[in-house]
Structure formats: C-alpha cells, structure tokens
Curated annotation (Swiss-Prot):
Subcellular location(s) per record: Secreted
Variant or mutagenesis effect after changing V1439I: In strain: MT4239 and MT8148
Family: Belongs to the glycosyl hydrolase 70 family.
Keyword Glycosyltransferase part of the UniProt annotation: yes
UniProt keyword annotations, A-Z: Dental caries, Glycosyltransferase, Repeat, Secreted, Signal, Transferase
Name of protein: Glucosyltransferase-SI
Phenotype when changing S1444P: In strain: MT8148
Keyword Glycosyltransferase: yes
PROSITE patterns: CW
Free-text function comment from the UniProt entry: Production of extracellular glucans, that are thought to play a key role in the development of the dental plaque because of their ability to adhere to smooth surfaces and mediate the aggregation of bacterial cells and food debris.
Length: 1455
C-alpha cells in the first residue's frame, strides 16, 4: 500500500536539503512550472519546469532534522524510500530568496522494487586507484598514491509530473503609458501587444519612440518590448550544494597541454582536461591525458548563455525541460549537472566524443556573440564583410606587420591619386576583395609572388621536366584589388626572362593580359611600357547597352563606333595608340551576376551576394538555358551574334571569345553548343580569310530607326581610297547591324556601304544573314550563289527596304548582315606574322596588324559540370580538340585557374570549385585532381595546344587565399572594402580566430621561395628596383614555406562572432594560457571557488544595479553582454540608462538598462538617430545599410530633401537615400535622383524602366505641359511622362500629336493612329478639322480630327459628300454604294444628288437623303439595276439594267 509522507524541509547553510532515510545522500530537486521555449526572454508570462536531481555528498546534511507526518495506514517493513520532491509553489524571478527557513513539500517514497532500478546510486565503491577528494567538511585532499577511491553518484533522474503554476504577470505599462500609446497615430494593439506602423502599413522594428518623455521600444518583431527593470534580488549561487560538480570539473593543470586552444587563447569551442570525469555518469574518476571535455559543459560567460546551453542540450539529450529568464542560477546549475551526467553516459555508450564535438559546435553557432550576428553590418563586401589585422597588437604580436599598405591601385600607387589619370575619378579600386587578403605591399610577399610567377611560367620544366609544357603568358586577376607594384614585378620579369621588350614576336608569343576594370588602368599600363595589355571596358559596355540589354534599356548604336579606346569612324592607323583586348562576356562577368539575379528573383530571395548552393545554381540554369532560347528574354543577353560580328571584325584590339557563348555554361565541357555556336564559329573562320585592313564605321538614320555599318577594306588597304592588290580585292568584310526589332526602312531609304576603291564592281555574298527563325550562315560562295550583290563603280554596296528590316527571334533582336567578297581561295589567310625587328619606342606590345591577327579563347566557364569520368575532365577534352581551336584561328588559349579548390563554401568560387578559391597556389592538380583534371592532364593539354602553335595562358591570382587549414588568433577590426573601420561594428581591435595558416606540409612548403636564389642570380635587376608603393625592393631573404596572418592584410568575416575568443567581460581581459600571464575562469583553477556562496550577474545593491562576472569580478567602465542584450556600468560600477556619452561616443540605454543597438531613436518629433551594432550613435556622413545609404549630421538622420555639399538629395521616411528613383516629394513635385550619386537631376532627360521619358527643370522638378527644349516643342503629361506617339488635347481643346521617336510636336504632317485613322496637323501643330485641300486633294476631317475615309459627311446645310475610302479624296461624278447597301451619286461639286437627275444619259431619282430610289417609269417594272464600277480614283461609272421580275411594290424599284 502506498505510503504518503508529509515532510518539512529545513534550511542548512543557505540551501534547502532533504535526506534519504536509507543513506546520507541528499536528493534535491528543483522547482516546477510551465513549459517554455528555449530562447524565451519574457519573464512575466512563463514559469520554469525542471526535474533534475543533484546529489550532494556532505555529512552535514544528515545533521538536519526531518519532520514527517505519516498519512498511510500500512507500508512494507523493508521499504527504503528515496525522497522525491515536487514543489507546489510557482517559481518567480525571486526564486533565489533565502529568507524563509522552512518549506513544505509532498514526498512520495519509492518502494524497494523501484529502488532496484537505481544502479547502486547510493553506494561508495572502493577502487585500486587514489584520487583527489573532498572531505565531509569540504576540505580538498590530494590523492594518496597508495590508495584510491572513486565516488559513484546516481544516474537516475526521478520523473516528476510538474505542477503547473501561473506566474503573476507584472505590469510594465501604467495607465499613463497606455494612454500615451493610444494617443499616437499608427500605434495599435493586436492580440494583446502594441505595434507601431509606418504610413505604408509595414511595422516599425527596432524602433525607440519617445512619448511624453518616456521611451518605448518596439523590438525586432515590431512588438512593444518589456522595459521592466531586472529583479532587485542578486543571483546568489549556493555553490556548495548546487554546483557540487565544480571541484571535479577544475582543470587538471594550467599547462597549455591541458587545453585545446588557438595561440594560447580559449575559444567558445575550446576543450580542456578536467581533474575528474564522471565516468558513465556515475563515478568520479581521475582523468587521463585523453579525457578532454568542452569548456561550455562546465563554464559559461554569463547566466543567459548558460540558460541557452541548458535548453539546447536538454533538447539534444531528450530531457524535456526548458528554462526561461526567471530561472535562478541554482536551478541552472542543477540542470547543467544533469546534462553533464547524461553526456558522460553517452560518451561511454558511444565510446567517443565526436558526437559531442558536433553538438557543442552547433550550439556555439546559435549564440550571437559567437556567430555572424555580432559581425554586422553586412553587405559591404563580397563575403558580407572584411577584417583588417592590427600592425602593433601586444596580444597577437605574431601577426603584426610593418606593411599592410592598402589600396595602392595603379591610380593610387604612391598613396595619392595620380594626376595623370582622370578618366576614373575614384582611386581606381579597393583592397579587400575575397578571403585571406594577401599583403602585396610586404617585400617578402612580393618576392614570393615573383617566385610563384616563375613557377607558373616554368611549370612544365619544374613539374614534368618538359619545357614544352610551360605556360607562355599570364592573366593577372583582380588588378584593382592588389598592390600595383605587382604589375612592375610581373612586367620586369617578362622582360628579363622572355625578352618581350625586344621585338613584336617575343611580345606576342608571351602576350599577357590584365583583369583591370578602372578606366585609369590602361593609360597607366601604357605609361609603364605596355608590358601587358588591358581590356577595352568602354567597348564592352557599348556592346552591352547597345545590343545585349532588353529593348527598353538599349542605348543608341553610335557608342559602338566612338565609345572605345579607338574611334572607329575612320581607323586607318598602322599601329593603334594603345594595345588592348576586347570581349562581351567572361567567366565572372555577365554570367554569375545573371545567375544571381535568377536565384534572387525565382529561387531564394534572401540570398546574399554570391553565396549560392549547388542546388540553387542547378535550378537557376534550368531557367537560364530556357531563357537563352526565348525571343523575349528576361535574364540572358540579346544579340550575342551581333556583338561577336563586331568583336571579330574590329581593328585595333585583340578579340577574346568566351567559352560560354559557344557552349552552354553548365553541362560537361564542350558537350552542348549554344544557339550562337554556328554564327560565332563562322565568324572565327572568316576572320582568318577576310578580316584585314583599315576600318570605317558609320551610323545611318533610316526609316523609323538607325543602323550601323562597319567595313574592313582588306589586306593592304588602310583607307577607302587604297586600291591594294589581288589579296586586297578578295579580302575585307562589311557588317550591317540594327538594334530595333521594329526597324522598317522607307521605300526611298538607301543603305550605302563603301567597301573601298579596291572593290569597285565586285561581287559580294552574305556570310551571315538574319531570317525569321534566326541567323543563316553561308560557308561558301556556292551556298550563297543566289544572293550575290555587286558594288557599283564607286565600290559601294547598296541595300534597300527589301534587304534590311528588323527581326525578333531568339538570336536577333534587330538586324544582322555580314558580307564578304566572292572569289577568295579556300585557304586564303590574311593574318600577319609578328616582326622580329627590334622595338625602339620603349614599348613592349604594339597594336598593329600582327597583334590584330591574334584571337584569344577564354576556355572555361565558372559553372561547367564536375567530370564524372576521366574523359570528361576539361584538360583531357582540350587536348582532344586542339585541331578545332586551330581551325578557329585561336592563337592564345586562356586556361582556367588550375589550382586545387577550397570547398569551404564561403563564396561562389569555392562552391563551384572554379580554381580561384585555393589554399595552395602551387598545387596545380599535383596532390589530387582539381575540377579540370590532374597535373599530368594539364601537361598533356599544354603540349597539345603548343603542337598547333597555340600559346597557353596561366591565371595568376595574387589577391587572395581561401580557408587555410590552420587557425590563428589575430587582433582585428571590422572594415569596409577600402580598409576603413565600419561604423556600428562590435569588432574593434578584437581578438578573432582566422583560418590564416597553411599546413607547412603542402606544395607551398615544397616550392615556396624555392626559386628566389636562382632568380637573384639570373636577374639581379629585379631585386634592385625599389617598388613604388613601399620605396624598398623585394625581400628574397625569407622563403614563405607556411602562410600565416603576418603576410595578410586581413580576411573576410568568418561567422565566428565578436566574442568567440573568450574573455572576462567585467575586466575585458581575454583568457590566456601564456605561461607568465595565465588568466582563466576562476571556476577552473580555484579549489575554493564553488565551495561558498558567490554573486554573479546583475545585482541591486540598494543604490543601483551592479554586475559581477562568472569569475567574480565587478564590471566598471565596461560594456557587458547578457545573451543578446548589452549594458554599461560606469566608473562606480552602476548600470546606466538614457543618453550617455562614453569615451567620446554617444549611446542610448533604455530604462531597464538595455542598450539600443541596430535601432532608430525617434525623439517624438520625427527627429531620428541611429545606434549601430556596437551601440554607437551614427554622427556625421554617409553610412551603408545593406545596399542602401543613410546620411547623418550631428547625430541626426537625414529625412526628405536634404542639401549636402551643394547637391540636393532625398532620403525617405526611414532615412534611406533615393538612388535611381523617381520621388514625389512633400511639395507634390516629382523629382529624380541619380542612380550613382543620388543627386537631384536638373536640366536633363531621364528614362524610367518602362521606357518613358521625363524632363527635369533647373529646380529638379519634372516639367508638365508644353515645353520648348533645344528648339523642339515637347509635351509632358500631368504625371511628368513625355508624350511620344500620343495624341494630346491641350488646354485650349486643340488636338496635337508628338513624334514617337523624338517627342517633337508634329506639324504639317499626316499621322495614323493605332486604329488606322488618319489625322493632319497644320503648321501650328493643331489637328485640322473640316474641309482642306492638300496636294490638290479635297479632304475632310471630322470634329475629332479623324480624316473621313469611306464616309458620308453631312455638311452644315444638310448636304452630303463622300470621301474615298483609300485616298480620302472627295468623290465627284461617281456612284457610291455604302455599307448599308444604299446607292448615291455625287455630282461635279461633290454633293450627293437629290430628286430627278439625268445621270449618264438616264433619268434617275434620289430621295431627300440622296439615296437612289428608281429610274424612269418604263424601266422600273421591267429592268433590274446592275451597277458595276471601278473604284479607282477619278474613274467613270457604268450603269446597265437587265430584265427581271421582282417582288417590289408597284411604282417602286429598289436597288
């Protein structure tokens, strides 16, 4: 029979205890309550649920008397009940109150059979090994070597059904508060919570609003936050009972070997060796050197982190209890002990700790201090953000540097903008691009870069002892993101080792290129000797906006002629001023950004930057490839073939063909051709045969649009007047292009293409022509025999509307025609070989006919598929297709970066493993295959290309290195891409763990610095030159065998958080294992810490709130984080509230002490301030928020129209700057703000995304009504949109029409509307009405301006006229039959006849409406009228009658 006992529990040394009648072991259970969420912070609405058991081995517990009232009638004599305690009192945030001395509990004893399941939980087991121990009085006794014992504790958690208690909810809102909230517009109460809505109906989030002097805060959900002050009762931890594990959990010794650390610093993922482990969850056993446990199992930086840990681990271990912020430290310690017991049980069962490592790491990532939340703001960098390393940190001196000279771009190489270069008004680039940013200003690093360059250029020799497998040249990646000294180093090396400055042949054989986007880079390179060539970015943009963009975004076509490094109106120079290469797309340009756009729009709108998954990429390409085949494209490029028709026929630049324009970007290498493959291949082959000579381009306005023509005169002819020789006559090419699919030429239009004097009276045939279905290629004279055209005696090809019109199909949105001479030999080759004559002008590369003859092939795509078998590797496929590349005329093959890729997934490059995200720069498939094959495959591919005379280009990527395998602690500051500290960041001279060390066992260890001695001996001049950015030469004295932080400027943020390296918050001191300066959490090292009561956390001392860290230190002049909340404690150690100035910065703290972070403060009058991620108020200047900007002046956020440095800008109600936006401002005026600067536009036209045009006056206001601008009379509707192709009725009621192209008011011209109706506008631009004589024709225009055609018009006197349905001319002397079947006859004055008349010799009758009724009496009964007429203008009528009987009334003959 069950026995129910009533116990009274007494207090012993500030702890509640009850004693088992069977032993001296005390079982203490904690308080019960309701189930809450693990991340709950609402103290008012939630209680705590627990059933953890803590066992305290102290004899003093047995001294306490226990009073029980027996309420049962019988019990077993052998029962040894274990007390199980259930609290009947609901827990509140004062659960640690220790003033009461007794408490009543219901205790349900267990039976003997139940106790048999407890695995000897109350036994002391003797062992053969001595261990350190605690005496009954709490004294710590070292182990005796001759004896040993282990202490066994219970592993049984007695299940308790919690008694649910409802907490009394403290009211944080007074009646005055409620009234104040109710008086504010847009604050509404929804489901018991208050929310503040913006005018557009969206919620204000992270928004502090001052109402009548009191601040109300609306949190990240938009709900009004609870500003209740913390409990005034301190967190008193009864460590001698509730933290009884502490003595065993102390560290074995403070030697660093007993910790997992990074550079002697502890991190959130550090493990350590405790003195004891609770083996199998039962027995405290002295640890071995293999027994490491996570630090977070026994120590936490604050109580909130401990609570989060307990809740997280409970969920992982199947313990169904959670704890809210009202939970006491006593309860959390008990829960943590239960978790530790469970962990040890599982370690024994699993026989490893791998699972625990994964679990702890996963928990760490949930804490804002240890994840990317504390690294905000984001989006100012390709990988969310960058970190700059300190040069003079005392804490991480191993990472210090004397260099880290940032942003030394070609424009800014000396640290000041070079006045010679003004095309780009910026400094021409920025330092931080990706990953570990290499410090290319460091002379030791510069020497290593040279060493690596030499390795690449001699790869075959070094790796395979085969010089035929050496690379010939390089592509320099990301020039605008590295120190420009590297350009001198590379150029000097190419001159010294390859002799590129000696003659054109040497230069062309080692033709190296730059990826340098700034407009200043090309002139800089030219001034440096043209040792390498750069892209013609202006031409790329011209191709993009004239041809590739959607129709409503296209510019005119003239930029294709003039917006380039070369004006091609008449390009007849032997040698261009500046050499260059040109392209329309590349592996990372106009490909990955299109994929990003698709992912954001249709797959994952929350994607940041270029951090895609492979699954997202796969889905995006399904859309991309489908779009490529569409006539109306949403994402992909239009008119790719048109771009290549110009690229491959232009003079004075080396064209580069992109792999992804011939083969699909995804899929196996060269497996799937694109729709543009045939057109590009045809152009490549034709280039060998025809493309040579001078060039002339023209823009012609024809019909309703424009076209451009481009002519190459042929080999030997630089000008149109040159007659050349036989080869001249059979070479040359004409390209005709339009970018308007609605292009229509007028009948009188002629497109005249001057092929030059060498081509008079010559047959030409099409190479490419546009058809309804796409582009038709003609590969021979025979194929195009029926389409031959001849030049006239001036050498002109002439085309008409019959030849040229606009098309819309998947390949062409506009028009393309390419024409070549008939009669060229099949093997004609007009290319020019490079000269070996010495170069004497101080330049290495010259853009002459020989360089023009070259073609580069960028032979890879970022997104090509991973090989599934050996034969699919890129380099294997390349080797098999070298004949094809030679047929195309490829002279320079740009290989993919051949480096084994990182797989960290931190950026697109490491996801797709394209070779740019490497950890070992010397591993070209040596250690294992990369995406493109093995090092041996690379050797074979290079040799195969060389066998066809094709030069091979390596990708030199000196900017970054990814995810190095070894970790290092650095002192870092969160910066933007220029290295400027980011406002609002928590990371300022903060210790941070980076992936900054290479292994020391890789190819870097083998080859790093290995060639420097050889290079010094061969080319000593390279090491004598003082570099521009540093003023000192390279330093070859150090060979970098292992990369480390001292060689980097910094890295991208890694998501480890601002607090990952652990410290004591109160003293702001990092926990360190440095032998002479060891500083560790006290609970790990102090044998007395944990055996007496201690105070931690927020404590009210009667005067104010103070804070004690878990190490027992009081916070003074310190910021303290408790979970996600931050507080500040002043010089006296008291928590502050309200506005505060601390160390020169402004902060704001709510009434409960919580600091405003990432929040707006509204003073109640819509004057806004912003407090950043570090709590500092933003003071002056522009600040980036994601992709948007805000502006602040003296701490006030700009809202509305704001004048800044003389320019007017606009900031919306949330403070975000308008860029590229049309804004109706508070005065009701429409304005536009520039897409780049954000400045208000004035005296300028602007086109919106719909293709509509606006004109903004000198005040920046959109004009409306009629305006004369540059001699044109224009009209702008009330919404500011310019009328184009529209009929507008002016204020006087006059109808006017505005030209669809120019928008100019139409005068003295006919216009037809969409219904086919015609209007005539007079010399004043007004639609005419009534009768008009125009060009000898008498016409009529109705009152709405519509011309009468095929209509009866009744004039004022009721007389009727009729106007021809085709010409609109007034009909005279003709019969007319209307649609109703009635016949009329119009006399020589144009009026319809009425009454009896003799018409064409017959007497006929017309009624009062002019309708023909009958002829003379003798005809009307016997003849049926048969009318035949010619509808031709001015024709005569013919009438005949035939005999017929009909059913008409007598005397009435109806027709």
């Amino acid at each position: 029979m069950e026995k129910k006992v009533r116990f009274k529990l007494r207090k012993v040394k500030k702890r509640w205890v009850t004693v088992s009648v069977a032993s001296a072991v005390v079982t203490l259970t904690s308080l019960s309550g309701s189930l809450v969420k693990a991340d709950s912070t609402d103290d008012r609405q939630q209680a705590v649920t627990e059933s953890q058991a803590s066992l305290v081995t102290t004899s003093e517990a047995a001294k306490e008397t226990l009073t029980a009232t027996d309420t049962s009638t019988a019990t077993s004599a052998t029962s040894q009940p274990t007390a199980t305690v259930t609290d009947n009192v609901s827990t509140t945030n004062q659960s640690t109150n220790t003033t009461a001395n007794t408490a009543n509990f219901d205790v349900k004893p267990t039976t003997t059979s139940e106790q048999s399941k407890t695995d000897n939980s109350d036994k002391i087991i003797a062992t053969s090994k001595a261990v350190n121990r605690l005496t009954a009085t709490g004294k710590f006794v070292p182990a005796n070597n001759n004896t040993a014992h282990s202490r066994t504790v219970t592993d049984k958690i007695v299940p308790i059904k919690p008694k649910i208690g409802k907490l009394k909810q403290p009211s944080s809102l007074s009646q005055d508060d409620i009234a104040a909230l109710g008086n504010v517009k847009n604050i509404r109460k929804v489901n018991g919570k208050y929310y503040y809505y913006k005018e557009d109906g969206t919620l204000q989030k992270n928004y502090a609003l001052n109402i009548n002097g009191k601040t109300f805060f609306f949190d990240e959900t938009g709900a009004l936050s609870n500003n209740t002050l913390p409990s005034k009762k301190g967190n008193i931890t009864n460590n001698d009972n509730t933290n009884s594990f502490a003595q065993y959990n102390q560290v074995y010794s403070t030697d660093a070997a007993n910790f997992e650390h990074v550079d002697h610093y502890l991190t959130a993922e550090s493990w350590y060796r405790p003195k004891y482990i609770l083996k199998d969850g039962k027995t405290w056993t002295q640890s071995t050197e293999k027994d490491f446990r996570p630090l977070l199992m026994t120590w936490w930086p604050d109580q909130e982190t401990q609570r989060q840990y307990v809740n997280y681990m409970n969920a992982q271990l199947g313990i169904h209890q959670t704890y809210n912020t009202a939970t006491s430290p006593l309860q959390l310690n008990l829960a943590a002990q239960t978790i530790q017991t469970k962990i040890e049980e599982k370690i024994t069962a699993e026989k490893n700790t791998n699972w625990l490592r994964q679990t702890i790491s996963a928990f760490v990532k949930t804490q804002s201090a240890w994840n990317s939340d504390s690294e905000k703001p984001f989006d100012d960098h390709l990988q969310k953000g960058a970190l700059l390393y300190s040069n003079n940190s005392k804490l991480t001196s191993q990472a210090n540097s004397n260099y880290r000279i940032l942003n030394r771009t070609p424009t800014n190489q000396t640290g000041k903008k070079d006045p010679r270069y003004t095309a780009d008004r910026t400094i021409g680039g920025y330092e931080f691009l990706l990953a570990n940013d290499v410090d290319n200003s460091n002379p030791v690093v510069q020497a290593e870069q040279l060493n690596w360059l030499h390795f690449l250029m001699n790869f075959g020799n070094i790796y395979a002892n085969d010089p035929d497998a050496n690379f010939d040249s390089i592509r320099v990646d990301a020039v605008d993101n590295v120190d420009a000294d590297l350009l001198q180093i590379a150029g000097d090396y190419l001159k010294a080792a390859k002799g590129i400055h000696k003659n054109d042949k040497a230069a062309n054989d080692h033709l190296s290129i730059l990826e340098a986007w700034s407009y200043n880079d090309t002139p800089y390179l030219h001034d440096d000797g043209d040792n390498m060539i750069n892209m013609d970015n202006r031409l790329r943009l011209s191709l993009l906006y004239s041809l590739a963009k959607p129709l409503n975004q296209r510019s005119g076509m003239n930029p294709l002629i003039t917006n380039s490094l070369v004006n091609r109106t008449d390009d007849n120079a032997e040698t261009a001023a500046v050499p260059s290469y040109s392209f329309i797309r590349a592996h990372d340009s106009e490909v990955q950004d299109l994929i990003r756009n698709i992912i954001r729009a249709e797959i994952n709108p929350n994607v940041v930057g270029y951090s895609f998954t492979m699954e997202e990429i796969k889905k995006a390409f399904e859309i991309y490839n489908k779009d490529l085949l569409a006539t109306e494209k949403k994402y992909t490029h239009y008119n790719t073939a048109l771009s290549y028709a110009l690229l491959l026929t232009n003079k004075s630049s080396v064209p580069r063909v992109y792999y992804g324009d011939m083969f699909t970007d995804d899929g196996q290498y060269m497996a799937h051709k694109t729709i543009n493959y045939e057109a590009i291949e045809t152009l490549l082959k034709a280039r060998i045969k025809y493309v040579s000579g001078g060039q002339a381009m023209r823009n012609q306005q024809v019909g309703n649009s424009e076209i451009i023509t481009s002519v190459r005169y042929g080999k030997g002819a630089l000008k149109a007047t040159d007659t050349g020789d036989r080869t001249t006559r059979t070479s040359g090419v004409a390209v005709i292009e339009g970018n308007n699919p609605s292009l229509r030429l007028k009948a009188s239009d002629r497109v005249v293409v001057n092929m030059g004097a060498a081509h008079k009276n010559q047959a030409y045939r099409p190479l490419l022509l546009t058809t309804d279905n796409g582009i038709k290629a003609y590969h021979s004279d025979q194929e195009a025999a029926g389409l031959v055209r001849y030049t006239n005696d001036r050498g002109e090809l002439i085309f008409t509307a019959a030849d040229i019109k606009g098309y819309a199909n998947p390949q062409v949105s506009g028009y393309l025609g390419v024409w070549v001479p008939v009669g060229a030999a099949a093997d004609q080759d007009v290319r020019v070989a490079a000269s070996t004559a010495p170069s004497t002008d101080g330049k290495s590369v010259h853009q002459n006919a020989a360089l023009d003859s070259r073609v580069m092939f960028e032979g890879f795509s970022n997104f090509q598929a991973f090989a599934t078998k050996k034969e699919e590797y890129t380099n294997v496929v390349i080797a098999k297709n070298v004949d094809k590349f030679a047929e195309w005329g490829v002279t320079d093959f740009e290989m993919a970066p051949q480096y084994v890729s990182s797989t960290d997934g931190s950026f697109l490059d490491s996801v797709i493993q394209n070779g740019y995200a490497f950890t070992d720069r010397y591993d070209l498939g040596i250690s294992k295959p990369n995406k493109y094959g093995t090092a041996d495959d690379l050797v074979k591919a290079i040799k195969a290309l060389h066998s066809k005379g094709i030069k091979v280009m390596a990708d030199w990527v000196p900017d970054q290195m990814y995810a190095l395998p070894e970790k290092e602690v650095v002192t870092a500051t969160r910066v933007d891409k220029y290295g400027t500290p980011v406002a609002g960041s928590q990371i300022k001279n903060t210790l941070y763990v980076v992936d900054g060390k290479s292994s020391g066992k890789d190819q870097q260890a083998k080859y790093g610095g290995a060639f420097l001695e050889e290079l010094q001996a061969k080319y000593p001049e390279l090491f004598a030159r003082k570099q521009i950015s540093t003023g000192v030469p390279m330093d070859p004295s150090v060979k970098i065998k292992q990369w480390s932080a001292k060689y980097f400027n910094g890295t991208n943020i890694l998501g480890r958080g601002a607090g990952y390296v652990l410290k004591d918050q109160a003293t702001n001191t990092y926990f360190s294992l440095v032998s002479d300066n060891t500083f560790l959490p006290k609970s790990l090292v102090n044998p007395n810490h944990g055996t007496s009561s201690s105070v931690t956390g927020l404590v009210f001392d009667g005067k104010g709130y103070v804070y004690y860290s878990t190490s027992g230190n009081q916070a003074k002049n310190a910021f303290i984080s408790l979970g996600n909340n931050w507080y500040y404690f002043d010089n006296n150690g008291y928590m502050v509230t309200g506005a505060q100035s601390i160390n020169g910065a402004n902060y704001y703290f709510l009434s409960n002490g919580i600091q405003l972070r990432n929040a707006i403060y509204d003073n109640g009058n819509k004057v806004l301030s912003y407090y950043g991620n570090d709590g500092r108020r933003y003071e002056n200047g522009y600040y980036l928020f994601g992709q948007q900007w805000r502006y602040f002046q003296n701490g006030i956020m700009a809202v509305g129209l704001t004048r800044i440095h003389g320019a007017v800008q606009y900031f919306d109600a949330s403070g975000f700057q308008a860029k590229g936006q049309f804004i109706t401002t508070a005065d009701g005026k429409l304005r536009y703000f520039d897409r780049d600067s954000g400045n208000q536009i004035s005296n300028r036209f602007v086109r919106n995304s719909k293709g509509e045009w606006f004109l903004f006056d000198h005040n920046g206001v959109a004009v409306t009504g009629t305006v004369t601008f540059n001699g044109q009379r224009l009209y702008f509707k009330p919404n500011g949109v310019q009328a184009k192709g529209e009929f507008i009725r002016d204020a006087d009621g006059h109808l006017r029409y505005y030209d669809p192209n120019s928008g100019n008011e139409v005068r003295n011209r006919f216009v037809r509307n969409s219904k086919g109706e015609w209007f005539l506008f007079d010399h004043n631009g007004i639609a005419v009405t009534g009768t008009r004589v125009v060009n000898g024709q008498r016409l009529y225009f109705k009152s709405n301006g519509v011309q009468a055609k095929g209509e009866l018009i009744t004039e004022r006197k009721g007389r009727i006229k009729y106007y021809d349905p085709n010409s609109g001319n007034e009909v005279r002397n003709r019969y007319v039959r209307t649609s109703s079947g009635n016949w009329y006859y119009f006399g020589n004055d144009g009026y319809a006849l009425i009454g009896w008349h003799v018409v064409e010799g017959r007497r006929v009758y017309f009624d009062e409406n002019g309708v023909y009724r009958y002829a003379s009496h003798d005809q009307r009964n016997h003849w049926d009228y048969d009318y035949r007429r010619d509808f031709g203008r001015g024709s005569s009528s013919a009438v005949r009658f035939r005999h017929s009987r009909n059913g008409f009334f007598d005397n009435f003959f109806r027709f």
